[in-house]
Amino acid sequence: MEYTVRTLLKEGDRVTGCVAYTRVEGDIHAFSAKSVVLATGGITRCWSVCSGSWEYTGDGHALALWAGAELRDMEFVQFHPTGMVWPPSVRGILVTEGVRGEGGRLTNSEGDRFMFDYVPEMFAGDHADTIEESDQWVEEVVSGKLATVRRPPELLTRDVVAKAINSEVKAGRGSPHGGAFLDISHRGEEAILKKLPSMHHQFK
């Protein structure tokens, strides 16, 4: 039987149990405990588009806060930056980082490869600053050679890519449905089928 906890019980400053309801019947129960450990998963369902389980609604964070706990470093949420926002049938499905690793290009509504504008100074030495250099890296790596140039900015860390996409959307350069475009069509169907079969199957 599974329960959803709605509140923590306290005596003074000490947590002594919780109140929860059964997920199927909705019956309310109170539990007393000598100690309570919150292990409740993430908070991804706080965002309208995500690939996380429906359960990841931040309940554990809220329970702790309501009970008087101090929450720290709440801004440090790791996002996987690419997922589907349209059409509705695939909304929230993750698009693997392999798509970018195989040469996927992030563009905005104006057709610009905007990631070149978001390379942090600390990563500038490792990432290409021209389309030509970026494309050369892809050609070398996907053909099994050692790269002789810097990697594409689409392969920056997840936090940088997620913030860049969000910045483009907020600036009015996002897709019609609130995202960005990830294009790998230049690799051709045969290469996509070989290297990214699951992505092809999900989104063909």
Model regions and ranges:
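A conserved short coil-to-beta-strand element within the FAD-binding core of flavoproteins
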Residues: M1-R14
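Flavin (primarily FAD) binding-site architecture
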Residues: L38-G52
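Short, well-ordered coil/turn residues at beta-beta hairpins
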Residues: A33, A39-T40, S109
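Core beta-strand elements of the Rossmann-like FAD/NAD(P) dinucleotide-binding domain
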Residues: V24-S35
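Short, acidic, Ser/Thr-enriched surface-loop or helix-capping motifs
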Residues: K10, R23, N108-S109
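Acidic, metal-coordinating catalytic segment for phosphate/diphosphate chemistry
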Residues: A64
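An anion/pyrophosphate-binding glycine-rich loop and adjacent beta-alpha core
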Residues: A69-F203
